Amino acid sequence: MVVIRLARGGSKNRPFFNIVATDSRNRRDGRFIERVGFYNPLATEGEEGLRIAQDRLSYWQGVGAQLSPTVARLVKQGAKKAAA
């Protein structure tokens, strides 16, 4: 099953997450099908903290991909931020 979830990057104490479409059997930071966006929890005021390619997210959901709970929360947060 294809899932859309976070893959951790960055360095120690400086997390950075890629939002990826991957097979659920792959490791968290392992092989992925496509990078859909990113999330930087430590972004400062001048930096972009969240970017999601909505067209690709819609495509993957259309072919049956499931969102992880955290990615679902981030998508909701991004939609709220875009509307404001």
Swiss-Prot record:
Signal peptide location: none
Disulphide bonds in the chain: none
Gene Ontology cellular-component annotations: cytoplasm; small ribosomal subunit
Keywords assigned: Ribonucleoprotein, Ribosomal protein
Keyword Ribosomal protein attributed: yes
InterPro entries: Ribosomal_bS16 (IPR000307), Ribosomal_bS16_dom_sf (IPR023803)
Organism superkingdom: Bacteria
Gene Ontology BP annotations: translation
Molecular function terms from GO: structural constituent of ribosome
PANTHER family, A to Z: 30S RIBOSOMAL PROTEIN S16 (PTHR12919), SMALL RIBOSOMAL SUBUNIT PROTEIN BS16M (PTHR12919:SF20)
Family: Belongs to the bacterial ribosomal protein bS16 family.
HAMAP family the UniProt entry points to: Ribosomal_bS16
Protein's name in the database: Small ribosomal subunit protein bS16
Native species: Ralstonia nicotianae (strain ATCC BAA-1114 / GMI1000) (Ralstonia solanacearum)
